[in-house]
Amino acid sequence: GTSFGHWAGANSPGFAPDVTSYDYDAFFFNDTAATEKYHLLRQTLQKYSTQKLPAIPAAPARLISIPRMTLSLVSSLCMGVDSVAASREPITFEEMNMGYGSMIYRTDLPQIATGSTLHIDGHDFVQAFINGKYVGKVDRVKNERTLQLPPTQQGDRLTLLVEAMGRINFGRSIKDFKGLIGDVSLTADVDGDEVTWTLKDWQMARIKDSYSHALRALSAPQSDMGPLVDLPKPIGYYRTTFRLKQTGDTFLNMETWGKGLVYLNGHALGRFWSIGPQQTLYCPGCWLKKGENEIIVIDVVGPREPVLWGQDNPELDKLQLERSLRHNNIGDKPDLNSATPVAQGATKAGNGWQTITFSQMAQGRFLAIQCSTTHDGKPVAVAEIYLKDKNGKR
């Protein structure tokens, strides 16, 4: 299914947005085909009816498949910027006169030699970049409010790309403002003390989700935000054309894409998010044309592969949840390539107990120890491990 645009809602408490549509468990699919639930209802009605029920009419919509096609990255997402603002404090989408879409927030960072923690209340999906390099995300769905940042130099550029998702439209959470809600701050340990910086002097740029803005971005020679924008590929606007000899309803498969919106021949087809479970967008045949057709995709995360196709059945139950590579499920191997060790060094030669002392406090859910020989770098085994606190207690 799809809501043909942006008006999906979200459940609360917590934040559980509908990616692109509500599922009310109806008796018919979008293409008017009867569901299993319809046939069960019909069987129940027939059981208590004294007359034979009329025959099920044939579905009026014809389903077609569209061959796999590759889209080209035509323009950076920043080319969709149509309005900019500057403020001492970050401002919301609503203060920028925008109900949905994405916003770019930019400010400068202080020098922090040890790395820091970014504290942020972002509605709804925030991606962080330092000098154009992606450093992480803050996802409201997971109730995330912090992000670990690497060491920074004075004047390093922090860019936050914030996308609005479904709105809570009931209860105490009905005032569901989008964007950065409140102050954004950094905390870090400096000489044993926790120091806090509240980030000020923000520059904002709005990117509306509309077909006209997409066309503008595809043809824009440069961004209105100029040198302030530094969003890397593969985030951006993608486009392709394809030809059809016959039209009919179809389901566009978006499972290789990241997160964003699809336009078909000028119509807002719906939103997508790779995590699913819905991986297809229903496309009514009346929006397709014999001859040349156009698809524009706005992806605020970037695709795994910029391909899509039309199929004659929906894919509504395929989860592709983001998984952490640092966990201790049986049979799993943590990925520590990008992790900064708390302690490293060589143990004494020989068997027996060895003591490893952390030079600073460390907090986490799991302890991972990577051991290898000094001769050829191959892994070695550890028989027992005991963790002790600063008082020597296990």
Name each model-derived stretch.
Residues 154-156, 248, 289-291:
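A glycine-anchored, Pro-Gly-centered beta-turn/N-cap motif
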Residues 164-175, 303-312, 353, 376-389:
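Edge beta-strands of jelly-roll/beta-sandwich modules across compartments, strongly enriched
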Residues 128, 184, 242, 385-387:
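Extracellular beta-strand elements of beta-rich domains used
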Residues 1-227, 284, 300-303, 321-335, ...:
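Carbohydrate-binding surfaces of carbohydrate-active enzymes
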Residues 115-129, 158-160, 242-265, 272-273, ...:
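Aromatic-lined ligand-binding clefts that engage carbohydrates, nucleic acids, or primary amines
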Residues 269, 332-340, 347-394:
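Aromatic, loop-rich ligand-recognition surfaces of beta-strand-rich domains
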Residues 105-107, 143-147, 238-240, 277-281, ...:
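Short strand-edge motifs at loop-to-beta-strand transitions and within beta-strands
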